[in-house]
């Protein structure tokens, strides 16, 4: 049976029915539904990334970093990490089977990520 992404946990924000709510010490949980999230990407993120897609989610981890997830289906992820002030964000396109690599990548930025499959 193929692995399916069900939740992503990051930082200290919790997404409740499309509305980000800060709760501590709990983490962000973004429920995977039909290939996209209910939060639209900000125009700032779109302009900085040069990528225009429907759906997705954006989240400022802190005052320095922005993290954006795109989901095409249950098997592919696109992750964008950008630092405020940088012109070009870091873009990673990953298969679900490489979630360990994604977690290791985020650890470089001191970001803990939990993905439930």
Where are these regions (language model features)?
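Intrinsically disordered, low-complexity regulatory segments enriched in Ser/Thr/Pro
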Residues: 70-96
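Amphipathic alpha-helical segments
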Residues: 40-53
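Short beta-strand-centered aromatic/proline hotspots
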Residues: 13, 18-30
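Ampiphathic alpha-helical segments that act as solvent-exposed interaction surfaces
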Residues: 88-117
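Short, structured interface segments
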Residues: 27-40
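Conserved short "hinge" loops at termini or chain/domain junctions
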Residues: 9, 13, 43-45
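Amphipathic, interaction-prone secondary-structure segments
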Residues: 50-75
């Amino acid at each position: 049976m193929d692995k399916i992404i069900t939740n992503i946990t990051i930082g200290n924000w919790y997404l409740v029915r499309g509305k980000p709510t800060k709760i501590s010490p709990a983490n962000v949980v973004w429920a995977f539904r039909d290939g996209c999230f209910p939060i639209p990407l900000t125009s700032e993120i779109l302009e900085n990334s040069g990528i225009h897609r429907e759906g997705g989610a954006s989240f400022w981890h802190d005052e320095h970093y922005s993290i954006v997830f795109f989901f095409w289906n249950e098997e592919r992820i696109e992750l964008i990490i950008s630092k405020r002030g940088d012109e070009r964000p870091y873009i990673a396109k990953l298969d679900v089977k490489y979630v360990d690599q994604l977690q290791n990548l985020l650890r470089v930025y001191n970001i803990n990520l939990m993905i439930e499959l």
